[in-house]
Amino acid sequence: MSVKVIVTDMDGTFLNDAKTYNQPRFMAQYQELKKRGIKFVVASGNQYYQLISFFPELKDEISFVAENGALVYEHGKQLFHGELTRHESRIVIGELLKDKQLNFVACGLQSAYVSENAPEAFVALMAKHYHRLKPVKDYQEIDDVLFKFSLNLPDEQIPLVIDKLHVALDGIMKPVTSGFGFIDLIIPGLHKANGISRLLKRWDLSPQNVVAIGDSGNDAEMLKMARYSFAMGNAAENIKQIARYATDDNNHEGALNVIQAVLDNTSPFNS
């Protein structure tokens, strides 16, 4: 077995539906991973400041691929961030503002931004995923490096909106689903696998050394990349098709069960 890196998504994967995880179990596992020199990476569409809130004791020890790959941190230090040009940002914002029913968050290096006129329920939902969230009068006046946009919609509207944005923003941003009604607009090529690849290069490791665990469309590239790819029991069907292996759902500690299999050297890690 040559596992040197374990990468996990958060929502619908590492976290249960109550947005918590079995901390005593994981902390014991983490100490064992550390002893064996196995690195732990969180890869999520969420904001870095939100992600570190789940790992206050470990935030300067582990690595984070945040914002779906647009922001990479190792041991508390920023290694990489994506960047839209000011012109590209204006095009994207202009397109999103065409639909008056569409609420969205603009994600930047310093903060995430939401319209001061956005519905309270939308702001409250987004605040759970973006711990730094500032209200703005005009998205076009944001003075920050922008690298992602996030929308939340009823599930039945998602395919139509994705198709529309795919055409309108072709070459500038790519829409991906991240579960729970979320659509993220990412810079083409700046997905989770790209962020993980940056860390692997730094560590002189390869995808052959990686275990990746996920449940949604934004996990597809990292699952295709990793030698040991696991779909959660609650994963979207297309993700189950992509992953080589399956684990339990997020309410039955599916991600922690994979980590335990690595530590116990049981199937598929014993072949």
UniProtKB/Swiss-Prot annotation:
Its EC number is 3.1.3.23. Transmembrane segments: none annotated. Keywords: Hydrolase, Magnesium, Metal-binding. Mg(2+) binds at residues 9, 11, 215-216. Magnesium. Can also use other divalent metal cations as manganese, cobalt or zinc. CDD domains: HAD_YbiV-Like. GO terms for cellular component: cytosol. Phosphate binds at residues 10, 44-45, 192, 218. It catalyses: sugar phosphate + H2O = sugar + phosphate. Induction: Regulated by the cAMP receptor protein crp. The active site is at 9 (nucleophile). It holds the Pfam family Hydrolase_3. One of its GO terms (molecular function) is fructose-1-phosphatase activity. The keyword Metal-binding applies. Its cofactor is Mg(2+); Mn(2+); Co(2+); Zn(2+). SUPFAM superfamilies: HAD-like (SSF56784). It is an enzyme of class 3 (hydrolase). Belongs to the HAD-like hydrolase superfamily. Cof family. SupH subfamily. Homodimer. PANTHER family: 5-AMINO-6-(5-PHOSPHO-D-RIBITYLAMINO)URACIL PHOSPHATASE YBJI-RELATED, PHOSPHOSERINE PHOSPHATASE. Catalyzes the hydrolysis of sugar phosphate to sugar and inorganic phosphate. Has a wide substrate specificity catalyzing the hydrolysis of ribose-5-phosphate, glucose-6-phosphate, fructose-1-phosphate, acetyl-phosphate, glycerol-1-phosphate, glycerol-2-phosphate, 2-deoxy-glucose-6-phosphate, mannose-6-phosphate and fructose-6-phosphate. Appears to have a low level of phosphotransferase activity using monophosphates as the phosphate donor. This is Sugar phosphatase YbiV. It comes from Escherichia coli (strain K12).
